[in-house]
Structures are given as C-alpha cells and as structure tokens.
C-alpha cells in the first residue's frame, strides 16, 4: 500500500502524528473527503459498503502502520485506530462539532496524533501497563 511504503521512514515515536497529518490532510481536501463521506453514509445501511470501508481503512492505512511498529495484537490495534480516525472524521467533517471545525488542522494533528501514538505503541490492557 502507499501508506506502507511511506511509513518505512517514519520513526516509531512519530507514527501517530504521521497518521493524523495524513488523515486530516486528506479529509481537508474536498475531492478526497466527499467520496469517503459517501462511503460512510452507504456503510451505515449496507453491509457490502461497510465491509469495503473496513477493508479500505485497515488494509490501506491502519494495519500497515501497526505492522511497521511491530506491536502486539495488530488486528485489534488496527481496528481501534480505524475507529478513532473514522470517529474523528465524522465529528469534524460530517457532524461539524464547532470545537473541531474551529481548531486549526495543525493543532488537531498534534492532539489526535498523541492518541493514535498511544494506540499504536502503548500496552493495551491495564495489566500490561502495570508490568
């Protein structure tokens, strides 16, 4: 995948920021956002569209990043990342939460990037965090 090729040169400690920058930069452009939003709407009522969206975001975006990092439970981490990204995308670009639409993209990249970084590289369970 394109992301898989690009992510090779990104230091592990910056993969969350990289993902956030790529995702927000992509969604900020109408020509990219509109087809994704259409697919999301379709996925809400059509299982085939839902499967296409799941595959698109995990195979082409989140799973290559998790595999690059080499973290445990890659499928779970990729799904969690997809949920965070899609939730953010819906909240900013479809539901238009004012706090998200009025905050500069660069600031959102930093905040979302930290969350994505945690999901990529930190222990997932409380037991793992304590050991």
Model-inferred region functions:
Residues 2-36:
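Hydrophobic alpha-helical connector segments
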Residues 19, 23, 60-64, 111-112:
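Amphipathic alpha-helices of TPR/Sel1-like and other helical repeat/solenoid scaffolds
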Residues 28-56:
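Amphipathic alpha-helical segments used for helix-helix packing
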Residues 4-6, 38-42, 99:
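Short linear capping/connector segments at secondary-structure termini
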Residues 50-54, 65-119, 123-129:
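Hydrophobic/aromatic-rich alpha-helical bundle segments in the mid-to-C-terminal region
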Residues 23, 36-43, 81-85, 89:
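Short alpha-helical scaffolding segments that buttress acidic/His motifs in well-ordered protein cores
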